[in-house]
Every structure is written in C-alpha cells, then in structure tokens.
Amino acid sequence: MSTTIDTIYDDFAFLDDWEERYRYIIDLGNGLEPYPEAARDEAHRVRGCVSQVWLHTERGDGDDPVLTFRGDSDAHIVRGLVAIMMLLFSGRRASEILAIDAENVMRKLGLDEHLTPQRANGLRSMVQRIRNEATEVAPAAG
C-alpha cells in the first residue's frame, strides 16, 4: 500500500508524541526516490530554506498538465517534509495543485506548532515554489 496524505494523518494520530512523529517524518524522507545529482544545482535549489533543498519539476503535456516533483534535502527532518510535499502535490494537474491548502494540511498534522520558525519558513518557500510552477502552466481562470 502506498502512503497518502490520509495515511499520514492516521499515522500521526496513532503516534503518541512528537519524538515518534519526527522519526516517522525522517522515515518518510528516507523513502524518497533518489534525487538526480545533476539537479543539485542553483537552478533547482529552493531559496528561503536554511537547509539545502532542491526541487525538480517535470511537466506533462496539455492545457492543464500534470506536474511531477522530485525533491531532496541535506537535513533529515526537512527531507521528510519534502516527502510530505511530494505526496501532497506530485502527480496532480496544475489546477489541482493550486486548489490545495497546504497550510491547512500542516495545521491538521500539527506541524505549524512543532516546527522551528526556520523550518516553517522553508516549508512555505517550498510550497510557494510548487505553486509558482503550477501557476506558470495552469489554464487561465474565467
């Protein structure tokens, strides 16, 4: 069974404390697909993150293309947060990505209260980068 955001909600509810949840987040990061070494460059780096974070986007065809994201970080917990963002956004159409309320997901997981301000800002930077990628290719509203 593949992990979904609903699975993460359920698993977080089951785990007793934040030490266990952080271990779970690290495990999610360890499950990321290997990130291409050639994409560990300035063009793919997410600015606004204290840790090194890289994000690579593949765009499908059409008016509302599917965007596939791959990401990585040099920090264990941040790599886990990258994994959560990949589960939330990757493999969706641009218009679907723009409709996702990532802040609400973070609140439901309790991350808004348990991340350092630096990690929370980095997470927002990653979400903004993903949203910017989707905005570039999403069909115009109207």
Question: Residue locations for each model-derived region?
Answer:
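N-terminal intrinsically disordered, cationic/polar leader segments
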Residues: 1-52, 59-63, 106-142
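Conserved interaction-surface patches within small, structured recognition/assembly domains
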Residues: 58-77, 86-90
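Feature captures hydrophobic
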Residues: 74, 84-87, 109, 121
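A generic alpha-helix surface/boundary motif
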Residues: 6, 79-80, 100
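Glycine-rich phosphate/pyrophosphate-binding loops
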Residues: 91-106
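Generic hydrophobic/packing signal
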Residues: 73, 89-90, 101, 113, ...
